[in-house]
């Protein structure tokens, strides 16, 4: 068949139209794909925002809710307190330490059955919303509602109030009563815990106050100067020179620096020591202890020996050691505390190293921290995290939170802990810790007399644990200005040990 020019032209145009249509389809497809891609990006963006919002709400409600509710500046707490009767705070055996009373007119007031006894540990909550201690740290749980949704609606309609959760502490009433009585009128503190778990068994500070009087007497309490402050929890916030209790750290530093021959240590004490370029450090009453090995020098609390040891310590190693023991660091605890301070640097003078070696100079510690160190020795070198809240339960008795022991970390080897235990046991059997020498529970510890001014005034310390071969309790005592033949603090500690072991 003969193809004319017109037919050829038509075929050509048809092919061109098809080609254009194909190209148009390709362009349309590309545009459609681009639009789909843009739509997907936008969709993914909004899905991402939604997921982020869900995550934020979960974190807010699960992780941060307690912190936010516990914040004293959170005004929504006032609204929560209008709907919830604050839960109880209980001792380790369920004894009530804090509860809410309601009078005939429906007015609520917080009641503390033991008055002064737990004023620093349990704390208080005032009519103005001010809170301290466990009342503050556990505010979230104490105001958490137990009721289900229907009960909450019923309460809203009737004007009734839900019951908050109850907080059970690790605190023992009998032990706390004994510690408080042993302190008497002395300023100071007692704190004790289980070395293997970190459970705080007692926490007492003096001067104290009756938590029931917060609404009438608080304005007076805040006028006291720092030395007489009743609001300061000396067990966790009081900073003191550690005195001879710091010889625990000095001894460990020497052991590590002389790991192959520290057991051959020998020092002839004539009552004082002078280091060229340093200063003269004297033993108590300039007592000449004669020849001593490291254990005996520790038991005698020989300043001459330990100031000499301090002067010879490698500064880098020493700094690393006390950093391991959390000096100048935050402590992993859920209550208010002060950081213990250590000032040794590479530029420290010989005199400062001497003073630091015996726990003087610019070293400052809290009883809490001193107890943690003793407890780590008792626990084969593992430092446990101290905690004061055992569990939280709703008003029906259902467990909401159960705290478990956790370790800060290993601060020394088991062998080092064993040697230091031997040193601390010798303090009791033949050294300065004679108050517990004949006690059947066989304690180990370290006494301390810490000079705090230029007038030969001293604080009295004791830190230790019992039994030395199977430790169940670690105790630390500080008596401000309580130095009396280094006996005062150890006698308070003895009372706590006696009570714990049933004597």
Please report, for each region that a protein language model flagged, where it lies by residue.
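Beta-lactam-recognizing serine transpeptidase/beta-lactamase-like catalytic domain environment
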Residues: 21-26, 93, 196-244, 249-481
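Periplasmic/cell-envelope proteins involved in peptidoglycan metabolism and beta-lactam response
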Residues: 1-219, 230, 239, 265, ...
């Amino acid at each position: 068949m003969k193809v004319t020019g017109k037919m050829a032209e038509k075929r050509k145009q048809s092919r061109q139209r098809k080609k254009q249509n194909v190209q148009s389809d390709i362009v349309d497809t590309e545009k459609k794909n681009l639009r789909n891609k843009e739509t997907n990006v936008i969709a993914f963006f909004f899905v991402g925002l939604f997921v982020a919002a869900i995550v934020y709400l979960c974190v807010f409600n699960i992780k941060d809710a307690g912190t936010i509710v516990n914040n004293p500046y959170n005004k929504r707490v006032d609204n929560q307190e209008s709907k919830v009767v604050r839960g109880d705070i209980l001792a380790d055996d369920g004894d009530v330490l804090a509860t809410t009373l309601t009078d005939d007119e429906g007015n609520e007031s917080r009641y503390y059955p033991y008055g002064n006894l737990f004023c620093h540990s349990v704390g208080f909550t005032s009519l103005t919303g001010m809170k301290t201690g466990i009342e503050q740290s556990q505010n979230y749980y104490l105001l958490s509602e137990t009721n289900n949704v229907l009960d909450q609606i019923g309460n809203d309609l009737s004007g009734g109030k839900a019951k908050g959760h109850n907080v059970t502490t690790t605190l023992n009433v009998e032990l706390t009563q004994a510690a408080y009585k042993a302190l008497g009128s002395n300023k100071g503190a007692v704190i004790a815990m289980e070395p293997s778990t970190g459970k705080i068994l007692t926490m007492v500070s003096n001067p104290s106050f009756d938590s029931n009087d917060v609404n009438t007497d608080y304005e007076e309490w805040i006028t006291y100067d720092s030395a007489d402050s009743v609001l300061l929890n000396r067990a966790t916030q009081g900073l003191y020179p550690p005195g001879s209790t710091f010889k625990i750290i000095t001894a460990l530093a020497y052991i590590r620096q002389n790991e192959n021959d520290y057991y051959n240590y020998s020092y002839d004490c004539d009552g004082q020591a002078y280091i060229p370029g340093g200063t003269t450090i004297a033993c108590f009453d300039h007592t000449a202890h004669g020849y001593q090995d490291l254990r005996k020098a520790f038991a005698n609390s020989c300043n001459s020996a330990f100031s000499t040891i301090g002067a010879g310590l490698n500064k880098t190693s020493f700094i690393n050691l006390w950093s391991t023991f959390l000096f100048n660091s935050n402590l992993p605890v859920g209550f208010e505390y002060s950081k213990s301070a250590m000032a040794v640097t590479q530029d420290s003078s010989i005199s400062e190293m001497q003073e630091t070696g015996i726990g003087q100079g610019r070293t400052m510690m809290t009883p809490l921290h001193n107890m943690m160190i003793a407890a780590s020795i008792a626990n084969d070198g593992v430092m446990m995290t101290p905690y004061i809240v055992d569990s939280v339960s709703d008003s029906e008795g259902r467990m909401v939170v159960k705290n478990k022991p956790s370790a800060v970390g290993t601060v020394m080897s088991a062998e080092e802990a064993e040697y230091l235990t031997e040193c601390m046991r010798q303090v009791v059997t033949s050294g300065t810790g004679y108050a517990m020498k004949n006690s059947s529970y066989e304690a180990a510890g370290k006494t301390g007399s810490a000079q705090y001014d230029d007038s030969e005034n001293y604080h009295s310390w004791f830190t230790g644990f019992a039994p030395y071969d199977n430790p169940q309790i670690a105790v630390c005592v500080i008596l401000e200005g309580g130095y009396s033949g280094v006996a005062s603090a150890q006698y308070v500690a003895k009372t706590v040990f006696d009570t714990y072991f049933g004597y």
